[in-house]
């Protein structure tokens, strides 16, 4: 998630479905030919856990970060988490690990654990590349590439705690900690950043919430993000890494993404996490609840009215978009000419009966029933909490 409006982390939407309520009476709209459909909605994201706009609204009302988190994750306890985390760097789509030369750069052979200082030989770049023989080699570039050493295992670059600049097809970016080659169970070579948990957070928090927001809100975000990372560390995505760097997990931008105010929030909450049953909680969060959070897969992610989300600075508390009926007909061609939209299930919370669980589109060729999440995704809507007006 980046900047305002704060985006939600897509993988944070993973949760078990709740038992939906029946649709509200009158949740049926007849669609004439060439109709314009106004879709009015509340919120942005899945609605589970902390609303980021709600956290800022609560901070503006004087709530501390601990009280903000207590509201959005009721029943959790406080604990600590430290150590390292390993992060997939998705921007590096190559098989090689390529970095800019810098003072103090070393390489470690992961098979034997030996760490070797790289010489000051005029190199501009260093890389670990695998040959056709399956052997990893360390190479350096002056005017051309030169071989330096062969490795028994994979390679890992480290600069004594100073940032290392990774070169990728998407551009250069600096990272704290170690950059290594990882190999997944499928045999894919990936680039992995291994670093201290709180240093990782410094590259997450300003991309998940504006660092300029109230300190209490940013601190709440730091704890929620730390807890989520600690949870993922216990449930790693791969044998090669524990968490990814996109909105499928938490957006992570490395050292280049850091900002002083968000670093302060990480430092002020150092090591603090929320626990459930003695383990890091599954602290989902999203941009805006729209005024009601949605029930998640665990008791500390309840559906509840959110009085903090609707402050004047939240542009996605209530929103609307207009689409022609042809958009829906092209998205679901099995319907033919669209004649009716009928919401069949909602979650029962808030305006219009709450978030849509399922709806049916009927037309001249047939009808299609889709989930609220599918409807939202295919139309690019901000949430499933919507209603319609036809003109």
Regions found by a protein language model. Give the residues of each.
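Conserved, single-site charged/polar hotspot
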Residues: 2-391
